[in-house]
């Protein structure tokens, strides 16, 4: 089961708990049709499309269980999946832009039900603010959570879609109309969802049904969708938003949850330990399985050194995570693996709260409000984060060339980056740490004249738990911030991602991992209604600038637009990028086909090629 949605960022989370290496079953003892993949993070849900479950590991599992019109390869290129279907522009007007998506005939879900374009309509339900409101499912921009707790609302799709998608007479083609040409239009189309299973689950069914019954259930979904039957749609929304938020799977788990069209289906899961997937025998929606793998096991180990030892013991086939320097040193000593390095697109950053997130109680902390005192104190706080020291001590031992980030929109090396950082206001946060501390102290004392290391101002920080690198990062930040006059009080939470939105916290730090490369990819972090705007940012001038990124433009215009946006972001002290995550993947020498991607899918984007 995979629910696709508009291109977004996923969060790189910390594992819920470390797994003792002694509990791992040796990979080498398994048949060579099994691949055991390490991940730092423990799975929290089988639906990564919700704000609180938008984590990289959840998305990785989903990647194996569903596939649509395209995938993104290790070069960050969009590759069309013509086995599933085709899509093309059918009207290219400046105020009437239409794309038709056609599903190939003969494709089936893992329960044997034929796939058609009705299965694409869930994407609209999950992404259109207008549909949610008109169907009585709630306002995604309001304080109350809508019936579908989707992270896909807001942004390019919702802002530009016109009316409802149009279904062809044979129900194999869906045509979308946008009010203008949009940038990266090929990434904002619909993906398939097994809507019949959502209906059956909402109706209380406990097992797989006949194809005839499944098609009748899909017809009921289509009828409810067309008529905007609020009661039926809300019952489906409850299933979509809650039923997949499980971490334990066994023989008693309802098999309707695992219907998908990917190469693998979920077989079992052990909370904070592992997820096992088996080959989908009815898979015919994508590239043929050319390898020898019929079982995929994700093992969750937060300690990089322990994971390296597990790899050495043959208990893992693929190591991929957030390594410490010690873990990398251990990996380099292994003779039975190939080590693949590089730079990941995931970026570490510190964020500050401005106001309450939707549905949360008022925020009355130190950073409250745009402009004035709130902005001064946010900037002072971000100046006190010792980015250079963090980079030198935690990242450069792994990647000696690791840069400090001057933008959270594009990375160093991107065409125009130097022009961007020279003009976007990031220079305010650059200099020796002593100079930055002095600047921070001046801003702090402007509002708290008595603030000092012996009389510090408290800042409550959400700290991702069970991650040694994050613990070390917070310790460095806490020590330096105290020199300025801030007392960073860390609340360490293993399951931290749902807590980002809480008004309890003045600041958080974690990583965003893009699932695709789009012009408007960072908009959701800062715009009103954006799926990742959980710090109460509400700046109409910034929203207007970010909206321009939805339109096709040349590189120079793109950079100029980001400059305008980041000048506001840095002047308000909303975020500060620290480093790009170093990419370290270690692979069993006998395993072929592992080609790590810098995007959030990492090693799992090409599962059909894996084999021994």
Name every feature range the model reports, one short phrase each.
Residues 34-39, 101-105, 172-182, 276-281, ...:
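Short, hydrophobic/aromatic-enriched beta-strand segments in well-ordered soluble domains
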Residues 1-29:
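Secretory targeting and sorting signals
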Residues 38-93:
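N-terminal lobe/hinge region of extracytoplasmic solute-binding protein
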Residues 234-269:
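Alpha-helix-centered segments that form part of catalytic cores
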Residues 587-612:
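Long beta-strand-rich cores associated with HINT superfamily self-processing modules
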Residues 82-92, 162-167, 266, 584, ...:
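Short amphipathic beta-strand and strand-loop transition segments with alternating hydrophobic
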Residues 2-3, 74, 101-135, 255-258, ...:
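Extracytoplasmic/periplasmic ligand-capture domains
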Residues 140-241:
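Surface-exposed binding/hinge segments that line
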């Amino acid at each position: 089961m995979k629910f696709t949605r508009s291109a977004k960022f996923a969060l790189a989370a910390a594992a819920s708990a470390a797994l003792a290496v002694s509990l791992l079953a040796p990979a080498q003892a398994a048949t060579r049709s099994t691949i055991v993949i390490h991940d730092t993070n423990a799975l929290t849900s089988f639906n990564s499309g919700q704000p609180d479950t938008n984590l990289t590991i959840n998305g990785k599992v989903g990647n194996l269980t569903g596939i649509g019109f395209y995938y993104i390869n290790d070069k960050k290129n969009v590759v069309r999946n013509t086995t599933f279907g085709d899509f093309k522009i059918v009207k290219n007007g400046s105020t009437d832009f239409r794309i038709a998506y056609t599903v190939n005939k003969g494709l089936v879900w893992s329960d044997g039900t034929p796939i058609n374009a009705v299965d694409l309509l869930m994407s609209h339900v999950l992404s259109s603010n207008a549909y949610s409101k008109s169907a009585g499912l709630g306002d995604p921009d309001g304080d109350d959570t809508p019936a579908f707790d989707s992270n896909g609302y807001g942004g390019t799709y919702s802002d530009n879609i016109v009316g409802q998608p149009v279904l062809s007479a044979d129900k194999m083609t869906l045509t979308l109309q946008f009010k203008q040409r949009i940038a990266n239009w090929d990434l904002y189309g619909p993906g398939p969802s097994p809507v019949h299973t959502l209906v059956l689950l909402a109706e209380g069914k406990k097992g797989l049904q006949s194809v005839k019954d499944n098609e009748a259930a899909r017809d009921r979904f289509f009828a409810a969708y067309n008529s905007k039957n609020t009661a039926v749609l809300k019952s489906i929304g409850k299933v979509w938003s809650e039923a997949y938020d499980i971490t334990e799977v066994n023989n008693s788990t309802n098999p309707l949850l695992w219907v998908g069209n990917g190469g693998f289906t979920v077989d079992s899961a052990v909370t904070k330990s592992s997820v096992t997937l088996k080959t989908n025998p009815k898979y015919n929606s994508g590239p043929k399985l050319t390898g020898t793998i019929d079982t995929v096991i994700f093992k969750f180990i937060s300690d990089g050194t322990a994971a390296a030892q597990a790899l050495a013991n043959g208990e893992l086939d693929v190591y991929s995570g957030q390594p410490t320097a010690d873990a990398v040193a251990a990996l380099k000593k292994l003779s039975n693996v190939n080590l693949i390095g590089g730079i990941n697109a995931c970026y570490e950053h510190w964020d500050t709260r401005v106001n309450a997130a939707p549905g949360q109680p008022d925020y009355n902390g130190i950073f409250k409000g745009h402009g004035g005192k709130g902005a001064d104190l946010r900037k002072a706080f971000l100046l006190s984060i010792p980015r250079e020291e963090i980079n030198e001590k935690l990242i450069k031992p792994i990647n000696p060339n690791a840069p400090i980030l001057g933008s959270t929109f594009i990375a160093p090396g991107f065409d125009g980056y130097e022009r961007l950082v020279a003009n976007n206001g990031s220079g305010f946060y650059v200099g020796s740490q002593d100079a930055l501390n002095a600047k921070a102290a001046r801003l702090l004392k402007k509002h708290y004249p008595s603030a000092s290391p012996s009389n510090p101002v408290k800042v409550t920080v959400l700290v991702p738990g069970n991650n040694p690198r994050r613990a070390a990062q917070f310790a460095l930040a806490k020590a330096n911030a105290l020199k300025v006059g801030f007392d960073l009080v860390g609340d360490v939470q293993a399951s931290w991602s749902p807590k980002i939105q809480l008004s309890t916290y003045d600041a958080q730090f974690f990583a965003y991992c893009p699932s695709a490369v789009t012009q408007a990819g960072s908009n959701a972090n800062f715009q009103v209604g954006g799926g990742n705007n959980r710090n109460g940012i509400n700046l109409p001038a910034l929203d207007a600038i970010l909206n321009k990124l939805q339109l096709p433009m040349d590189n120079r215009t793109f950079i100029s637009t980001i400059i305008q946006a980041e000048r506001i972001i840095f002047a308000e002290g909303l975020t500060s990028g620290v480093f790009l995550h170093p990419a370290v993947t270690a692979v069993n020498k006998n395993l072929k086909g592992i080609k790590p991607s810098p995007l959030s899918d990492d090693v799992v984007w090409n599962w059909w090629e894996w084999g021994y």
